[in-house]
């Protein structure tokens, strides 16, 4: 989600990086910090590490996610296709 929204959140991420006193205050520095934190807490890099792709039902989940009221808080307007792409990237571990 971070990398999907990068072009609209990059300046906000710089402010967060400043607050966190990260050495590298760029978007990439913040992303590296998040990925390192995820590794520290043993959070898998790919959703496919915890769920079988055939069980995911991407179409159904994408529709449900788009209908969720919290989706309106995303910095970018999302389409059903955007949701599907994010789920596919979550499964593969591809960061866009």
What residue spans do the PLM features occupy?
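C-terminal charged capping/lid subdomain of soluble metabolic enzymes
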Residues: 10-96
């Amino acid at each position: 989600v971070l990398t999907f929204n990068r072009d609209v959140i990059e300046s906000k991420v710089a402010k967060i990086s400043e607050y966190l006193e990260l050495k590298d205050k760029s978007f990439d520095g913040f992303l590296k910090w998040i990925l390192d934190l995820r590794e520290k807490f043993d959070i898998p890099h790919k959703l496919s590490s915890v769920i079988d792709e055939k069980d995911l039902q991407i179409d159904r989940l994408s529709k449900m996610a788009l209908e969720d009221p919290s989706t309106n808080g995303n910095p970018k307007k999302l389409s059903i296709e955007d949701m599907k792409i994010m789920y596919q990237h979550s499964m593969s571990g591809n960061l866009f």
